[in-house]
Each structure stands twice: as structure tokens, then as C-alpha cells.
Amino acid sequence: LREIFIVLLIDFYTHTHVGKENPGVITYVEMSTIDAQTSENIKMVIERDQLAEYLAAPVSGGQKDAKEGELLILAAGSERSYEKCLGDFEKMGKQSWLMGPECKNATDAKMALQIMMGGQAALLAECLSFCEYAGVDEKVWFDVLDKGVMMNPLLRSVGNRMFKGVENNRQWPQTLFQTYLQQKDLKLAIETAEKVHCEVPVTAAVHQRYVKASRKGHANEDFASLRDAYDEKKK
């Protein structure tokens, strides 16, 4: 008997198939970045067929965080299901939160994090492109940024990867988080925003930059390849 079954996939049909193929699971934990409706649909199938209790628990963090047990886990569901999973969450992540009883409490919070992540990377790429076109030394400017209050671990990591990709003939094969995944997450965020009648003009503009990066051949490369979406002169 598996007391907890953790899933991190991207399509609805695979999720439900996995649930049906693993009867006897007490708690089914959905850790993918999906929208609230998809999460609710999976929950409906899992609980309708009495396969398990359902806990939405999308994660924030990259491959390095996953390997080192440093993920941030945003859960939503019953307190009982959440408490059952705490031991596993403590091994997988740096911290976990019970965001509320409904799937959307976790999925929408994760969307907001992806908006922040995607937006910061886009703004950094835009700043570096501006420096290049204006004749400012990009690396010196980045060093200035690095010494100030605006720097954070995400910008530092993405910025360094942007420089490496430019030096590597504008290719970013070493992938920490793929461009198409960030593009997908922003699209989900925009669709969710429309449903709740929230304006997200900045996110919509940022999403188009990721679309452009994908069209330039960077879909399966690291999302630091967004640097190339701001450059028409060089390839």
C-alpha cells in the first residue's frame, strides 16, 4: 500500500491514468504547475473513483533545488492530507505552506510566482540589450547591479547564464528551466487572470518575449535564452 503518491506531470490524461493504475493510495499529491480548473478536474476523477484524497501542491524551484531538497511547496486541500505529507515535504523542500482548502489557492499562488520569475528574467534581458545598444559595458553594468539592493539569487543566476549563452554563439544548452515551460506557465497565468478579471498587461508583454525566444529556436534551451529575444542585430 502506497500511503502517498506524488505526481509531477504536465497533461491531464496521464495524471488520471496514473491515479487509476495505483489503487490503494491514501493521498494523491499533484505537484505540477497547472491551472486551477485542471487541478479540480484531476481531483474530481481521483475522489470520484475513491482512488485517494487529493492534495494540490505545486512546487517552486529548479533542478538544483530539487536535488538539494530546497523546493518551496504550496499546498491546498484538507489539513489532514497536508499533515500526512509533511514528512515527505520536509525531505523535498525548504518550506511548505497550506495555502487554503481549494485547489486554486495553491495553483494561483504558483502562477503569481511564475509571473514574478518570468518578468524578472525578461526585464534583465531587456536591460542587458539596452546596455549593448547604448554602448554600455554589459558586464560592468551587471557588476553594479550585483552590488546593489536590486540583485537577488534569481537575477544573479539567470544573468550569468545569459552571458555564457551569448559567449556560446547564443546557445543555451545547459538547461535549468526550459524556455517553453516558462512560456507555458505565463500563458496559464494570463488565462487565469482573464477568468478572474485581472489586468496583467506586463505579463502579456513578457509572454510575447518568450514566444519570440521559442520561435528563434530556444524553446528547449534554458530560459536565459530570453536574452536573444531582445536582439535583432546579432544571432
Where are the regions that the model predicts?
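Rossmann-fold dinucleotide-binding core
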Residues: 9-14, 27, 32-115
